Amino acid sequence: MLAPRGAAVLLLHLVLQRWLAAGAQATPQVFDLLPSSSQRLNPGALLPVLTDPALNDLYVISTFKLQTKSSATIFGLYSSTDNSKYFEFTVMGRLNKAILRYLKNDGKVHLVVFNNLQLADGRRHRILLRLSNLQRGAGSLELYLDCIQVDSVHNLPRAFAGPSQKPETIELRTFQRKPQDFLEELKLVVRGSLFQVASLQDCFLQQSEPLAATGTGDFNRQFLGQMTQLNQLLGEVKDLLRQQVKETSFLRNTIAECQACGPLKFQSPTPSTVVPPAPPAPPTRPPRRCDSNPCFRGVQCTDSRDGFQCGPCPEGYTGNGITCIDVDECKYHPCYPGVHCINLSPGFRCDACPVGFTGPMVQGVGISFAKSNKQVCTDIDECRNGACVPNSICVNTLGSYRCGPCKPGYTGDQIRGCKAERNCRNPELNPCSVNAQCIEERQGDVTCVCGVGWAGDGYICGKDVDIDSYPDEELPCSARNCKKDNCKYVPNSGQEDADRDGIGDACDEDADGDGILNEQDNCVLIHNVDQRNSDKDIFGDACDNCLSVLNNDQKDTDGDGRGDACDDDMDGDGIKNILDNCPKFPNRDQRDKDGDGVGDACDSCPDVSNPNQSDVDNDLVGDSCDTNQDSDGDGHQDSTDNCPTVINSAQLDTDKDGIGDECDDDDDNDGIPDLVPPGPDNCRLVPNPAQEDSNSDGVGDICESDFDQDQVIDRIDVCPENAEVTLTDFRAYQTVVLDPEGDAQIDPNWVVLNQGMEIVQTMNSDPGLAVGYTAFNGVDFEGTFHVNTQTDDDYAGFIFGYQDSSSFYVVMWKQTEQTYWQATPFRAVAEPGIQLKAVKSKTGPGEHLRNSLWHTGDTSDQVRLLWKDSRNVGWKDKVSYRWFLQHRPQVGYIRVRFYEGSELVADSGVTIDTTMRGGRLGVFCFSQENIIWSNLKYRCNDTIPEDFQEFQTQNFDRFDN
């Protein structure tokens, strides 16, 4: 037995000698901090130690026991005056955490948290805190629990240099004893090596992970590695030395007992029988017993007849009971693949599951435990935890996930979110009211519009008798069109109410509430009881924009409140009328290329002198330069048409290069062709040479929701591909009188309301038109038609494709059959019902065109009847009708429908005519007063309706047969 012990001692000697040769650390200086210690250090004396700038390493060692799940501050250094913390170590049992707080150099407290520590479990624990370089910055902290390193923290901020209080105000506090709790040891150690300090707790450190070398050079790294590997061997040497001391003591006692017996006495036999005595037997060594602690620590020892017998090695070790070697459970792969396994002495610990997985941090002892308690990490289904935006496709992968596009029925992306994609074709995804029409706009947007005879926001619709887009009763929605109609039976889409009495002006007999009925009131919409009228025109002073000048038209070009009749600068351009070459058109530059005295801004022939501005055919082109040569029939003569051979009545030229969009290969002039490679341009009307399209929907980012960049989003833009037209507006209009000669009747009087979306004609007049200035290619035109009187029974309607006063389409409705009272130039008979006519008059406005319009049927060289309602039913007094017109001049498609309430009462069906290839819109009257055209709407639309293809197929088959 001596040989192995001697070898172990020799090995220990060599290791220690090598350590000494490498340079031993200074002797540790130990301060006992327990209040019961006779050598207890005054807390104030700790400060010079803790704030010594030459101090590199500082150690705190403590032994304690806490009840399960309890929390306590083990020790701390505080100011007795303001209770501020300098240093504190706290255990939080319920959270399995420990917290170290210390005062930083900037006067703030720094906090270090140690997780997954079971310190409050009713068992005795030893901790060792090693703090390094805290006075120099970038310090580090190591925590050892029961002789095993469990955590380390680096790059700690610099600690305090010293307190502002006097040393005698510094106070050390330890945790208050409770039943079954105790603080056995609390010491502060300065200087010395980690292994020297650890030995104070009877620890030969077995680290959970390799320590980083604290010195520099290959020798120090090699030395620390060897010391780590020999930690366990040193523990065994300690056991052997303890056993050797006990055996040596036993031998000494045995020898002493033998000497006490004295020398042996022999009786000399006779020579004849002398037998030489046998040599004395060597003393018998007593068998070794359990009281000499021969077994490995923790192994049960049993005395036996022959000495002792050791039980099996503890769980986590392997050996014969005397010598037990730690088992590396990590070799049996107890941890989840990819998770770091840490071999402990004894036992093992698995790190946390990888990112994207969830599972326990397994810790145990022994091969059996490692084999039967494998760490299980379950993939986290991030898709169930809302990793992607709602209503988008989420693909869960092992340890991760991937977000995809929006689910079917939703639109958007991972940045904007996925919103329900309203789908008009799928009833389940159609959000509209059953009494509303679902319209799919550009880029998939859906708009709900209440059907004819209904009003509301499209999601909720209520009855609307007068079809002016306001319901008869208020609806439970917040949109403007959910409010109750203030004139239930008279269409008034502007809901004007001058006296705010809740009754709209259109149906209020005293609209201004001054006690004077409208028929006698000279200011119908302005309260004026005195009815004063200085200039004796039809407008009282309260509403007259020229008090002393008779002006029944009340025209005010610049909208400054002063009528043109008394305004010396009608257009408000700063140039007096007498000097202004365009008195009704603002033009401060007064440019006049042809020198005819009429500025270019208002000159109907800017390049040809025409001072009288004669325009017989009312096409806005002066007679002096009007050639009427129009190759493509779109209403623009070839000399001014920006696409002379391509139909483009709208004359849109986005890039202002003189070439209309309809014949321009690059409308926005950004270098990307509209259709051919390297196009097509994903923003045809907005320059974007880089063609950015972040959501890959084929529409460039710059024009995603506003294709023409006119600052009106496509959903409410009446012409999403024309920046010059955004809303329906007839406030600017041209009056065209179709029978200017004679005095058979007077000219029409037009009143425009609701910001240009409602027109009222008040007089029993000659045939006339109010024509807007916006020209259209394909267009949808709708409005509500209402005759608000029981007097007379003549024509009212609307026009489209207007090119000049001799060329336009008209839809006109007569109430009763009647022969025109002027028999010259021919007898004209009007039949009741709706008529669709193409006007192409060789004479233009006059008696021929007048009688041709009145007559139901074709009139040579004047009017062709394209369709007539076969019912021969006239309009009813004070009943509202809604019309819908579709015109696609590129193919000659025309279709018009009329509704009474929600009932379709007339439908022209598909009508093909190419007489006018586009033009302007307006309204028409002939000998009928008090006509209301309400809730007017137009919309650019070049899409060919589906029924056109059906019509072509049917007619082709008919022709083929």
UniProtKB/Swiss-Prot annotation:
Entry keyword Ribonucleoprotein: no
Biased composition (Basic and acidic residues): 586-596
Record's compositionally biased regions (Acidic residues): 660-671
Residue ranges of every copy of the TSP C-terminal domain listed in the record: 731-945
Region spans: Disordered: 579-672
GO cellular component, one term: extracellular region
Record localization: Endoplasmic reticulum; Sarcoplasmic reticulum; Secreted; Secreted, Extracellular space
Entry's Gene Ontology molecular function annotations: calcium ion binding; growth factor activity; heparin binding; integrin binding
Positions glycosylated per UniProt: 612, 941
Regions of compositional bias (Polar residues) in chain numbering: 640-652
Keyword terms: Calcium, Cell adhesion, Disulfide bond, EGF-like domain, Endoplasmic reticulum, Extracellular matrix, Glycoprotein, Growth factor, Mitogen, Repeat, Sarcoplasmic reticulum, Secreted, Signal, Tissue remodeling, Unfolded protein response
Domain (EGF-like) ranges: 286-325, 326-363, 379-419, 420-462
PROSITE patterns cross-referenced by the UniProt entry: EGF_2, EGF_3, EGF_CA, TSP3, TSP_CTER
Entry protein name: Thrombospondin-4
